[in-house]
């Protein structure tokens, strides 16, 4: 079985730094490395049949293989892409970027051959002693078996490997500002215990300069997000370094960075997946890199919109969604500094059919164009729990419209094929009427009852196409205060004046207001609902002032208005909430909006519903 492995591969990697080979190795042991709040990293002891080496480390995109136990002790895998990092003491670490599990641990079962540890200090591999020549069969090498390839072949998290990562980045040399040469190391290998290092990274985000005052005077900072093939890191420059580097560094350009200070990252303020962050100091060097094609752009770790409800308040997430609709930008005044800032809500939907409200601020809000319903990828949006789950796009967040990544193409294909016909179910505050009027959470009246809507601590909102089957016209109108902002019932003083207790004023006139109880029904269920002024007028087709006059002067005509409203169908937007009165709990349903039925749109939605049901 030794012949299945790439004998001598470990020596070739450790002596020559050869990253062009794709060796077949066996995993002997895996152990996790503590990484704080970041995704775990794993160190692997691997064998090529002749030697073993414990200097293998997996990149975080391989974590699912370990967690699903596809990559485990005794399995055989092909290393398709890796990086060799040389530490300052001369030792080498191999970072595994892509691999494919060829044979599972269950199939192999045991360690292959009798490999001995590779002694890096000797510069030569230690060769296992030859096995006794017991029989010709024992020394013959079996051919590799044609087993099915395991599910361990990986694709980079956010970008296709061929398009984004290109060639593997092995160790290389760069000139720093002091004229000396230092090895370029991967971001993933940086720790506070290293003094001399250089990374080659792409700038994926650059903040504006922030200023503040304290006892030391005026201070300022700006921050960057940097990415290479192995990972990402946040860098911050203060004061003199702001003046020095801010004009020189551009987003999406690649630079050599060296001699920064590394410290434990504050995860409260960044979505960057790294335990450490970099601070520029007086010795920091930043130099442009012309050969930038092999480096990725922004790295995303997407959270599905339906999973946002499981995220804690104020956590930072990466999200991708179609801009289903958006609002106009408005101006608000920030209380803390009394500055006016632009604000715009956009509504994002993904393949789960869930919709989340995301708020853009400042320049992002002013310049946003959602007219073509773009795919938006947002890195580092903050989760809010106000009225559900919503997102705030921070100044440190990165927004990319129609990114060139597989998730975006998949989402666009789904939306064009079927998603655009869906209204979506909002996980954000629905009191405003949903997604720009479009997110209506369609339910049948039976579903409303069977799903116990309105039974929770907060009200639920839904929309339904239903028919009016009965209107309770008794006591449906009352005389109200004539002032514009008051709808309080007035008291007839029997002297030609009407008193409003709320306004503490007597008026010579009043206005009619309506509270109409209506029984609506669809093909499965019926429901009593309460309609206030605008909703009642929409159902009856007449305004309250005319109906009040009709009630006083022509009772028969008044009756006919109600008769004509029977068996008319509408789209009802309803709020449901359980209420307790005299120790008795019941669901109160209040109509928030009434619209005529668009039967073309209604028919299309029914067809899509039938198609979805057929796939279940």
Curated annotation (Swiss-Prot):
Residues 146-155 have a biased composition (Polar residues). Transmembrane segments: none annotated. The modification Phosphoserine is found at residue 384. One of its GO terms (cellular component) is DNA replication factor A complex. InterPro entries: Euk_RPA1_DBD_C (IPR047192), NA-bd_OB-fold (IPR012340), NA-bd_OB_tRNA (IPR004365), Rep_factor-A_C (IPR013955), Rep_factor-A_N (IPR007199), REPA_OB_2 (IPR031657), Rfa1 (IPR004591). GO terms for biological process: base-excision repair; DNA damage response; DNA replication; double-strand break repair via homologous recombination; mismatch repair; nucleotide-excision repair; protein localization to chromosome. PANTHER family: OS03G0429900 PROTEIN. Component of the canonical replication protein A complex (RPA), a heterotrimer composed of RPA1, RPA2 and RPA3. The DNA-binding activity may reside exclusively on the RPA1 subunit. Interacts with PRPF19; the PRP19-CDC5L complex is recruited to the sites of DNA repair where it ubiquitinates the replication protein A complex (RPA). Interacts with RIPK1. Interacts with the polymerase alpha subunit POLA1/p180; this interaction stabilizes the replicative complex and reduces the misincorporation rate of DNA polymerase alpha by acting as a fidelity clamp. Belongs to the replication factor A protein 1 family. This is Replication protein A 70 kDa DNA-binding subunit. It comes from Pongo abelii. The gene is RPA1.
